[in-house]
Amino acid sequence: MKLIRFGKEGKEKPGIHLDGKNYDLSAFIKDYDESFFEQNGLQKLTGIVNEEKLPLVEDGQRIGSPIARPSKILCIGLNYAKHAKETGAAIPTEPILFMKSTSSLTGPFDNIIIPKNSEKTDWEVELGVVIGKKASYVSEAEAMDYVAGYVLHNDVSERAFQLERGGTWDKG
C-alpha cells in the first residue's frame, strides 16, 4: 500500500495506491499530515482499507507529494563514502546537516522551479525517511518505532549556490 495525495496543487486529497489502482480516502481521512501520523493514522488506515468499499480516483488526476507539508525536511550531505569520493570531497568526520524548504515539495510529475541564474542544477534520487512521531534522544534500538515509512525523494540542488559561495548548504 502506498500513500498518495491527488488533486489540484494546494487542494490535494488523501488516497492510496493499492493493487495498481488509486483510491480516494478523503471521506475518512483529512490528510497525511503530522497529526495523522502522531494519532496512529497508519493503523486506522489499515482498518479503513480492510473494512470499507473505497471509491476510485478519477483518471487524469494530478498526483501530489504523498505527505502534506511536513514541519521540516532534514538532509544529510555526502551521506556515504562512495558518494563523497564521486564528488571529489573528503569523507566528512561529522554528518553534514542541512534543511530543505517544505514549500519546495512537488508531485512526481510537477514542474520543478529552477533558481534564476542557476549554473549547476543537479538532482539525486534519495530515500526519505518519514518520522511519524516526535522524537528526542531516541536509542538506536528504539529508532524504528518512530519511522512511519519511506518515500522516494528527488533532491534538486543548485551546486554553485550551495558549494561555491560559502555559507550553509540550505541556499542550494
What feature does the model see in each segment?
Residues M1-P95:
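N-terminal non-catalytic cap/leader segment that marks the start of a structured domain
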Residues P70-G172:
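Glycine-enriched loop-and-adjacent helix/strand subsegments that border the catalytic/binding cleft
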